[in-house]
Every structure is written in C-alpha cells, then in structure tokens.
C-alpha cells in the first residue's frame, strides 16, 4: 500500500476524531486548537537531515478566534500556538509512520520568535525536519522546525520532541 504524502483539511479533521491512524493512536487536536489546514508534503526522506520532512499550512483570516483576545486592540497570533502546531506535526509524523499510541509533546530545545502573525497575513507555513525517530520501548521523534508567514520565517524551534504512548496512566 502506498503512503499518502499530502493531507487535506478534512483528512486532518478525521485525524482529530481518531479516524485516520486508528483508535488509541496519534490524533491531532480538534478545532480551535488544530493549527493546520493542510499538509502539502510529508516524506520519510529529505529535509535537512535526510530522515523526513513535513510542510503544512494554516490560512489566516482576521476572524480567527485568537485575534479577538490576544491582544485587545493589538491582535497577534500567540507564538505558543505556532510552537504547538510544530509539535502537532511531529506527532502526526509518528502516526503516519504507523507507530502506535497517543501523542504527547515532550519538550524542545531553543525556541526563537523574531516576527509575528497579524490579522492582515494570508498564510502560515510550517516546515518540520526530522532529526531522529526512536522506535522501541519509547517511540519518539526529534525534529527542528520553523514557522513562516507569507514567505518570511518568524519562529524557529530546535529539538522538538514528541512521543507516542500506548498508556498514559503513569505520564
């Protein structure tokens, strides 16, 4: 069976309901916390480290929920949502690889913010470069990522770590 290498908004919504990778396996959050509209490319090869990459997008409109509350009179997308989107995508990669369990963000190395997403923006693009996938007692991916708005890079994150767990009882 050939793996799918791009995913629509409807595919991602199916993933948020647990219908894409099967019950008990990696899910994306449901809207409003789903910070991705489509994955335009996912591969087990390529990227900066030759171990896999993802490219995904979020369409920006002035009526997105976070602009009304962050900040009143000075609307800007919270940087933590861009960081969470990168974790979401690393977890999606693990599910796409067929690794069982529920995804959990486990941390990151250095995160830098040097730009912002305003209501006038059109599109956010996420680029994820897989550095390593650990398979065994702990199934985990480590990746570097970046967030761009309308073609300009505005955030970077190193060593994004996400694991998948068949039980989160002792987490």
From Swiss-Prot:
Any idea which UniProt keywords this protein has? Cytoplasm, Fatty acid biosynthesis, Fatty acid metabolism, Isomerase, Lipid biosynthesis, Lipid metabolism, Lyase
Q: Which GO terms describe its biological process?
A: unsaturated fatty acid biosynthetic process
- Listed GO MF terms: (3R)-hydroxyacyl-[acyl-carrier-protein] dehydratase activity; trans-2-decenoyl-acyl-carrier-protein isomerase activity
Q: Which InterPro entries match?
A: FabA, FabA_FabZ, HotDog_dom_sf
Any idea where this protein resides?
A: Cytoplasm
Q: Organism's domain of life?
A: Bacteria
Q: One GO CC term of this entry? A: cytoplasm
Catalytic residues per the record? 70
Pfam families attached to this UniProt entry: FabA
Q: What is its EC number?
A: 4.2.1.59, 5.3.3.14
| Catalytic activity line of the entry | a (3R)-hydroxyacyl-[ACP] = a (2E)-enoyl-[ACP] + H2O; (3R)-hydroxydecanoyl-[ACP] = (2E)-decenoyl-[ACP] + H2O; (2E)-decenoyl-[ACP] = (3Z)-decenoyl-[ACP]
Predominantly, its location class is cytoplasm
PANTHER family linked to this entry? 3-HYDROXYACYL-[ACYL-CARRIER-PROTEIN] DEHYDRATASE, 3-HYDROXYDECANOYL-[ACYL-CARRIER-PROTEIN] DEHYDRATASE
Q: What does this protein do?
A: Necessary for the introduction of cis unsaturation into fatty acids. Catalyzes the dehydration of (3R)-3-hydroxydecanoyl-ACP to E-(2)-decenoyl-ACP and then its isomerization to Z-(3)-decenoyl-ACP. Can catalyze the dehydratase reaction for beta-hydroxyacyl-ACPs with saturated chain lengths up to 16:0, being most active on intermediate chain length.
Subunit structure and binding partners:
Homodimer.
The UniProt similarity line reads: Belongs to the thioester dehydratase family. FabA subfamily.
Q: What is this protein called?
A: 3-hydroxydecanoyl-[acyl-carrier-protein] dehydratase
Give the species this sequence originates from: Pseudomonas putida (strain W619)
Organism classification, top ranks?
Bacteria, Pseudomonadati, Pseudomonadota, Gammaproteobacteria, Pseudomonadales
Gene behind the chain: fabA
């Amino acid at each position: 069976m050939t793996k799918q290498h791009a995913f629509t908004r409807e595919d991602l919504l199916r993933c948020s309901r647990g219908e894409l990778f099967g019950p008990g396996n990696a899910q994306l959050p449901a809207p409003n916390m789903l910070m991705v509209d489509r994955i335009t490319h996912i591969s087990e090869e390529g990227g900066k480290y030759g171990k896999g990459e993802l490219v995904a997008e979020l369409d920006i409109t002035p009526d997105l929920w976070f602009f009304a509350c962050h900040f009143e009179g000075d609307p800007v997308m919270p940087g933590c949502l861009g960081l969470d989107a990168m974790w979401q995508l690393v977890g999606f990669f693990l599910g796409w690889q067929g690794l069982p369990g529920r995804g959990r963000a486990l941390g990151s190395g250095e995160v830098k913010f040097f730009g912002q997403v305003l209501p006038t923006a059109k599109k956010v693009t996420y680029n994820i470069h897989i550095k390593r996938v650990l398979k065994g007692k702990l199934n985990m991916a480590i990746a570097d990522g970046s967030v761009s708005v309308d073609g300009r890079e505005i955030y970077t994150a190193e060593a994004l770590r996400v694991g998948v767990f068949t039980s989160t009882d002792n987490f």
